[in-house]
Amino acid sequence: MRVLILAENEFEDLELFYPLYRLREEGLEVKVASSSLEVRVGKKGYQVRPDLTYEDVKVEDYAGLVIPGGKSPERVRINERAVEIVKDFLELGKPVAAICHGPQLLISAMAVKGRRMTSWIGIRDDLIAAGALYEDRPVVVDGNVITSRMPDDLPYFCGELIKILKRY
């Protein structure tokens, strides 16, 4: 089973690497996609080399999607293909896990209206304005969408994602 992570520069380091390694511990294959194959650098300086570009992503090859936070989602969401990938995962009912600023991509995918969600407090108003039902909790699961607020919530975030993937 494969999981895809979307990332650009200034991702929140822990929010990319914690799920990447935690999912690998569960025996899942995890790939990182970006707008190019150039090394991406997190806010704290950790680096990741993307495995593929957004253009090369075939959603049917993946069981789930992870969207780390930091400033990366601001960059990912302006890429039309990346937003299309998010929409495709949602339309196929596949798990989509977004943490911190990650839900910005769900806003761009027009996928938050009426959905229970959480996020970093700095984008709470954006989610509410887009129609989300905001909850200030470590993790919120609404159907196939998992959201969390910050790095401290990663154990809950990954735990819920793994539970859902095991049912998939």
Swiss-Prot record:
Transmembrane segments: none
One Pfam family here: DJ-1_PfpI
Domain of life: Archaea
PROSITE patterns documented for this protein: PEPTIDASE_C56_PFPI
All copies of domain PfpI endopeptidase, residue ranges: 1-166
Gene3D superfamilies, sorted: 3.40.50.880
Family note: Belongs to the peptidase C56 family.
This protein's name: Uncharacterized protein AF_1281
